[in-house]
Amino acid sequence: MEARELKANVRKESGKEQARRMRREGLIPAVLYGPGTDPVSLSVNASDLKTALKGAEENVLIKLIIDDSGRLMEKNSLIRELQIEPLTNNFFHADFYALRMDQESTFDVPIHFEGQPVGIEKGGELQYLKREIKVSCLPSELPDCITVDISRLDVGDAVLIGDLSLSESIRCFDSKDIVLVTIAALHGVNKAEETEEASS
């Protein structure tokens, strides 16, 4: 995964009033923290953050270019939490988790399912049982998501975690036997159809 750059400034002041003033100026309060990193209060441009996140999935690698009174420093990070105002849908606060590019970290990677299963046309029910997996890898090896083609799934078929094609550099913590998605037979519907045919 390629890092997306985002400018930030060290925030010297704190408090609700200062946060309100920042938001009126198009900025949002943020914090950077992580192993070996003292928590740093930041401010980032809301529009720049929106641009950095455009088209991104759950995991977004952000290279923060931090200005501390004219002294610049770079920190690779992952957005751990992004608070959004429910009424305006504007960004409210961001948490950045500092990463070391030469050290493996644990991530939750979303699963995207593509295609219309053939089992649906036969009366099966599509059931999503798990939509993400937990992995360990270097930040540069972290995928945006894992795409699974389910168009060939018939009634009774399933996709397990062990069926996923993962890079050798990615280690999955979840059991290979866990079911991600399945096409279940609707026994109740089939039974009703059989009863209807028998009575006709």
Swiss-Prot record:
Annotated keywords: Ribonucleoprotein, Ribosomal protein, RNA-binding, rRNA-binding
Q: Which GO terms describe its cellular component?
A: cytosolic large ribosomal subunit
State the InterPro entries in the record. Answer: Rbsml_bL25/Gln-tRNA_synth_N, Ribosomal_bL25/Gln-tRNA_synth, Ribosomal_bL25_b-dom, Ribosomal_bL25_C, Ribosomal_bL25_long, Ribosomal_L25_dom, Ribosomal_uL5_bac-type
The ranges of region (Disordered) come to: 1-20
Gene Ontology biological process? translation
Which terms in the Gene Ontology molecular function aspect does this entry carry?
A: 5S rRNA binding; structural constituent of ribosome
Q: What does this protein do?
A: This is one of the proteins that binds to the 5S RNA in the ribosome where it forms part of the central protuberance.
The similarity annotation says: Belongs to the bacterial ribosomal protein bL25 family. CTC subfamily.
Q: How does it assemble?
A: Part of the 50S ribosomal subunit; part of the 5S rRNA/L5/L18/L25 subcomplex. Contacts the 5S rRNA. Binds to the 5S rRNA independently of L5 and L18.
Recorded protein name is: Large ribosomal subunit protein bL25
Lineage, top ranks: Bacteria, Pseudomonadati, Thermodesulfobacteriota, Syntrophia, Syntrophales
